[in-house]
């Protein structure tokens, strides 16, 4: 990395150093050792908790002792993805970087700017002798990428700060002040196997080609849910014919809107052509309903060999009614930030596992009570259908506070420096900030960062000019922090 071309030099110096240290999620020992050694070399107090989270403290510069204590926070792990032709060893090899125009990239791997640039910014501030600031604490958390492990493990009393600035956002000029918490509600229908009538018409029906997407970021975009569309058609068949259901399968990940779903069914042979007509009519209906958001939607219906066994009729009836009734999509919009989803639910997957039909749903909200309410709505729909239902403990959200004092400082600073107002946003997905707020409810927070693109992939890149703007803004915020 040619540091001379990069500004601010100190930030890119430490980013280059961090790139030399392997730091996959759950294998952060080397970067932890680097950070502890850095603190010792700088003569700064450093504490490490049982999870591996590190807190490095730096006293206020002269004349700034009366400012509130600021916690700068990043996570130290990175997503390790590489191209198929790369021989990179993430446990031992440094990340090789190069400059492409205004972008910093890595050779065939993830760059690790998520969240290495946050770390580098913290280290540059901790090492600086010419930056004014009040009392500082720099929090470095472990294993954010695979489960927010460090944030979950953080104990009360580990930090003393009043204000927390998360450095893990990916769009310069945008300030985030809220995120969703979440929980999964897991449903199980027990069923009995019954003999399937062998003289019936057996067929597989499938819904495919849907856009899908993230169950938080994309839940408000009116994209179709393959499980919902499939169940709607199966319900029509069950209402018209002597209907048997042999198999059902849809969706995969709890945090993804399902793109495909299929079922293996049977009806009397005399209704073979009726079912095909029903399918054509239904396909035209849903193509019309989702003409904008689902241009590649398609259905398939094909003959299959007879199944020996089917799901008992009572369970099928209760299953189809429950899947029809359960909420999917936006449940409530934020009253603090127009256009932001506050609460939602995702009907994520329907699987047949170990003699049971297992359904996974995911609820999100920036308000804990609303998330619990959403989970109870889902629970009620399935309990009415006779299923066993369990909801996970989940993780907390971060309710937006547009009146935040540190947000006002950040907005005023940005306008003063760059002549435009930053965008204030919240995200309908999980961030570490929600967990911090649960244990330190007094914290005044916002999240910021330079522009990154292609994160979590070998296409990850960082916009070099954005780093300089992010740096200048952060330093100006630090010197204008409210007094104690």
What are these regions (language model features)?
Residues 16-20, 262-264, 298-309, 348, ...:
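A short beta-alpha structural unit
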Residues 64-146, 151-162, 202, 316, ...:
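Active-site metal-coordination/substrate-binding segment of hydrolases
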Residues 157, 223-240, 270-272, 318-324, ...:
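His/Asp/Glu-rich mid-to-C-terminal helical/loop segments that flank catalytic regions of hydrolases
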Residues 76-78, 139-147, 169-172, 211, ...:
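Acidic, glycine-rich active-site loops and adjacent beta-strand->loop/helix elements
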Residues 7, 11, 335, 342-355, ...:
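Zn-dependent metallopeptidase/amidohydrolase metal-coordination segment
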Residues 218, 225-227, 232-248, 400-443:
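Active-site-adjacent substrate-binding region
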Residues 102-105, 145, 152, 156-364:
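Midchain, well-structured core segments that form catalytic/ion-binding scaffolds
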Residues 2-103:
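Acidic/His- and Gly-rich active-site-bordering loop/insert found
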